[in-house]
Regions:
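Solvent-exposed, well-ordered amphipathic alpha-helical segments
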Residues: 18, 24-36, 69, 127, ...
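Bacterial N-terminal signal peptides
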Residues: 8-20
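G-domain G4 guanine-recognition motif of GTPases
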Residues: 71, 114-115
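Active-site-proximal cofactor/substrate-binding loop regions of enzyme domains
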Residues: 23-106
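Positively charged n-region of N-terminal signal peptides that target proteins for export
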Residues: 1-5
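Short, conserved sequence motifs used for protein processing/export or organelle targeting and
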Residues: 83-109, 115-210
Length: 210
């Protein structure tokens, strides 16, 4: 198991959260090169999910993309308890359900840049969403460590008021699981960038740079 605390995720997810908010259209620099966050909502108990898991694995290797797997727990009842499923991931997906005005949650679902949702194994739709999301405004962010080794994230002020949140992700880069029950019984499933912890970071106000 290769677990990684993603500082890159902090940058990208800060952008993600801002980009999905109403005032974001006037923020940042349009077309600025940055990361596009792709969230896969998946479950080892879902027979339709392995193709989406493999697609996310390919996306995870591409530059300019932060691909993350959020395992949900609402399929656990059909025979296999996903070891990475969590209620918090299911809640996050339900929040997206309201954002995108959907009547239900489903797997596999990919959310691209916080702006588009597509079926998780539809590679053409996912790539089209990534292309579109990469054109969205970005909020300039600087990442550094102080003398004590603490992480500092500086989000530049914008002339237009925006709401900003910074999320930090801890994820396993690759996990292999032999599924013994449920729809995927007998299969070995490989999951990539499996989110194990996902937290909102506190934001304070720093004095302006001189």
């Amino acid at each position: 198991m290769n677990r990684k605390f993603s500082l890159t995720a902090a940058l990208a997810l800060a952008w993600l959260t801002v980009s999905a908010l109403p005032d974001a259209a006037n923020a940042g620099q349009k077309g600025r090169n940055g990361l596009t966050v792709v969230e896969l909502y998946t479950s080892q108990g879902c027979s339709s999910c392995p193709p989406a898991d493999r697609l996310l694995g390919r996306l995870a290797k591409q530059s300019g993309i932060l691909a993350l797997s959020f395992h949900v727990d609402y399929w656990d009842y059909i025979g296999w308890k996903d070891p990475y499923g969590s209620p918090s991931n299911s809640r996050r997906q339900r929040d997206y359900k309201r954002t995108f005005n959907r009547f239900y949650v489903y797997t596999p679902q990919m959310v691209v840049g916080g702006m588009f949702e597509v079926t998780g194994f539809d590679a053409a739709a996912v790539l089209a969403g990534i292309k579109q999301a990469s054109l969205a405004p970005n909020v300039p962010i600087d990442l550094s460590r102080d003398g004590a080794g603490d992480l500092r994230i500086l989000i530049s002020a914008s002339p237009n008021p925006i709401r900003t949140a910074v999320w930090l992700a801890l994820f396993d880069m690759e996990n292999k699981t032999r599924v013994r029950r449920g729809e995927n019984s007998g299969r070995t499933i490989v999951n990539y960038n499996v989110v194990r912890d996902f937290k909102k970071s506190a934001i304070g106000t720093a004095p302006p740079r001189r």
